[in-house]
Amino acid sequence: MKKIEGNIVDIYRKKIIPGFISIENGIITSIFQNGKKYDHYIIPGFVDSHVHIESSMLTPVEFSKLVIRRGTIAVINDPHEIANVLGKKGIRFMIENAKDSLIKIFFTIPSCVPSTIYDFSGEFVTSDDIGELIESGDFIGLSEMMNIPGIICNDPEVMQKIEMIRKYNLPIDGHAPSLRGEDLRKYVEAGISTDHECTTLEEALEKISLGMKILIREGSAAKNYESLKSLIISHPDQVMFCTDDSHPGDLLSLGHIDKMVKRAVADGFDLFDVLKIATINPVLHYGLKVGTLRKGETADFAIVKDLVDFEVLSVFVEGKERYNLNSELNSDNQMLSIDYSDLNKFEREPILVSELKKSVEKDIICIGVIDGEIVTKKEYFSIQNPSINLESDLEQDILKIVYLNRYRNTKPQIAYIHGIGLNKGAFATSISHDSHNIIAVGCNDQDLACAINTIILNKGGLSICDSGEISFLSLPIGGIMTFSNGIEVAQIWDHLIEKLHAMGCYLSSPFMTLSFMALIVIPELKIGEKGLFEYSKFHFLSDI
């Protein structure tokens, strides 16, 4: 029997009890109060209610090493990034790798692969695939349902996916940015139980009124805590915390779910409500096998120095200490010798500079970037002189943006984007939600072609090209992940970001923001297979 002492935070009874926890075979057998004084606190481990581990560019094992040190004990992972590239093979890779992680990783089945009929991904996940996957017992629900028109119009394939999950009485996550009114009612009635895309309080309250749970998101690209934080006091039982997408640099320096907990406590919200949102609410909603510091449950908890900064001293998972502040985690890469050539799909040939030409007349439509958001604006600009090839207009902060299918040799789609700040060079990425084709932004065609071709020749990664000088992070797993450890990746990532900032880019997370510029299921203007796509009308401008 193991005994752990400290100030035990009882969220259910809203009490802090000095005492000890008895653990046997990974289960809490008793909790005793002893009246002693302790300088540390025992709390339930944090739960991320919606995350795409692939967005960290790390495997589940390496991801777990970064978040456990922040008190995270479990995450609900939607593997739709790797599924868009490799389908069921990619999903199985994530599940198998997660078995060796330090935390509990639960999986939902990707619902929309590809995201829409307008996307071109490497693979499909059909209703038949979902039926096969759900029978495996490896999944706790259906991932974010992005095909809103499919639900509203009762598309047979979409509705069959939903019915398969409802048959098992499992939760279905939502993805409904700006959805309101009658369309929202139909969406909820289909069985959608959560949404993590709310950007305004009014939107969140309407969804709560219809029975949805709201996931307050604070990731590397989308940050909605400030807009939604009053829900912590008004609806503490209807909200959860999530990160959605975070890069390793932020996980190391800013934290994970703990950063929202610290912020909420600092903002004066009730400690027990905040901890409930970060721990108990996702456990109950998703039916997770995660302990919450009660007798008879698994011994899953964190020991923190205080209830202000929440510095993590140690973390226990099923009674075993998986992290200790004084013992460095093993960051050795155990998988470098693995042949992961079958874990990628890259059929694209390099492009020529001449393929990037685009003529413009006086007025152009631009994607308007908002730093800290993944939504964009539809903006109009006037160009003084018509051009047979407008590479950029730096005075107006207008750059060329290129979308290139990596699964087949189609012509590049070219448009313009405003709000990046870059004044020289170009950068590109094969992380491009959700189909993970190549997307690039640049000031001139020569550097654009260089950045794009660097990714093609290496079959995935992040690249910067400045007058021919290349900086690069290789991502050999599906063109979106690496087997390298989080510290190594964070160092390269930080170097790339510093370089982009030195080149004039003022976005806080340039690659993360760029990766969402092809996600056409997020408002308002994005770029895809046929050029610019307008979300509110759900069509390509070229189709008008």
What are these regions (language model features)?
Residues F124-E144, G150-L215, A222-F241, L252-A266, ...:
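Histidine/acidic residue-rich metal-binding segments in metalloenzymes
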Residues M1-E24, F32, I68-R70, L252-G268, ...:
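Active-site microenvironment of metallo-dependent hydrolases
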Residues H52, S56, H80-I82, T108-S115, ...:
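Active-site beta-loop-alpha junctions enriched in small/polar residues
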Residues V47-T59, P114-V125, S193:
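Active-site mouth loops of central-metabolism enzymes
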Residues M1, Y38-P44, R70-I73, D100-I105, ...:
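Short coil/turn connectors at secondary-structure junctions
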